[in-house]
């Protein structure tokens, strides 16, 4: 109703499943989905791909969280080899994961903002991607 009244231009959804998105699409065009997703929490892998096929933006929340100590050490090793920070590598992985991923990382200072922006310039080579893709599900257990 709000969209029909001109009060809302576009509809985005958060914390939704494929089924819920399909249900919403029967009523309105969906332009963006925001769910938890990052280099180690990839439960939405198939959803990211589906949305990319449909031209729908995906905004991951918690893009830098959830690392175990083992994952963190492996992530840091990749970062060190690239002359980057671990967080830059994690953001770069998301940006390289799919063209429909849009990042809104938090920042606490101008220096932090510059570090976040530098992640967009970081190109992860195949060997780094291979290492990073093994982080999912790895823990100390």
How does the language model describe each region?
Residues 1-141:
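Beta/alpha (TIM)-barrel catalytic core signal, keyed to glycine-rich beta->alpha loops juxtaposed to Asp/Glu
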